[in-house]
């Protein structure tokens, strides 16, 4: 593939943007090489500035569950912008969005719109601290909840990709208020609550870890956390920025049958536009300003164009059988990848929940952060580049989940697996 225009753009970008990108994982530092620059996207495909086409399993890191540039979403945006780009005042679409989320998600009686997943998690934790009168939070190794200071302790996503355990610039006093647990560790959670439970405002968790690749919860684990939080008077926050409306219509909480006190959202509810939200029990959400004393605000929150895009996307995912078909397509991909690796003599296992998946270069079932970080990263990096050269774009880090869309039909998946068979053979050499 020719990447001359991408190469020139990246060289220019590095003189203007830190690392040449506006989000670290995009720079390919984990996998090596240089990123390609995207010119357009359609369906399951990305097209770069050098006119190369890629089957895309990143999907803008999750939002594009119906594929890129879906006509219904595009038309909703085009219609909305005819009426203006931003009002800084209430609009009807905000109400419709809140109604939709509240109807579909078990935990959400009220909703507040924000502009990103990071804003959502920061706001949810502030609400938890204000509502409980406590300061400490518990998070999990490898889970990423945005770049808020409280969350950059043993975080996943770009932090894990770059091998940074805790970011410089986070005051020690603040990081000391964040306790960490190993995901899927029942005994560790019980012991930590026995030690500090009376000080804990909230437990925040990705119910399916998507920022240390894809790690599902063991049977009963989320309910165990629910029980501990209730017993000790702490709030349970599900970060469903990735899992919301993807692993099931009602998110991971509906899929696993565990209802948190608060939930954070992003990605799919914006249809590709910048957006976030948090919601939960009415008695908690009514403590948010101006109804209550816990302050949170945003100039562009509830932006009408973002609401239009998100509502169009949520209409698509409510179509009968949408999530069943998405899960079946993801299973087809994962089973095919394992078969292709096995044929090449490569140790690979996959995890899948609905339309999320993870690819691990190991023989073991991966159920924890420690297992994810023990996988063969060198082989993953070689596989990543072998697939990229064959026109398949996977997440450029061994520590990021993959995302399926409804635009990935059987022919697209078969083309992916044909590329994978060749790529695994390259890795085996």
Swiss-Prot record:
Its EC number is 5.4.3.8. The modification N6-(pyridoxal phosphate)lysine is found at residue 267. It is an enzyme of class 5 (isomerase). Signal peptide: none annotated. GO terms for biological process: protoporphyrinogen IX biosynthetic process. It comes from the Bacteria. One of its GO terms (molecular function) is transaminase activity. It catalyses: (S)-4-amino-5-oxopentanoate = 5-aminolevulinate. Keywords: Cytoplasm, Isomerase, Porphyrin biosynthesis, Pyridoxal phosphate. Pathway: Porphyrin-containing compound metabolism; protoporphyrin-IX biosynthesis; 5-aminolevulinate from L-glutamyl-tRNA(Glu): step 2/2. It is found in: Cytoplasm. Pfam families: Aminotran_3. Its main location: cytoplasm. Its cofactor is pyridoxal 5'-phosphate. One of its GO terms (cellular component) is cytoplasm. PANTHER family: GLUTAMATE-1-SEMIALDEHYDE 2,1-AMINOMUTASE, GLUTAMATE-1-SEMIALDEHYDE 2,1-AMINOMUTASE 1, CHLOROPLASTIC-RELATED. HAMAP family: HemL_aminotrans_3 (MF_00375). NCBIfam families: hemL, PRK00062.1. Belongs to the class-III pyridoxal-phosphate-dependent aminotransferase family. HemL subfamily. Homodimer. This is Glutamate-1-semialdehyde 2,1-aminomutase.
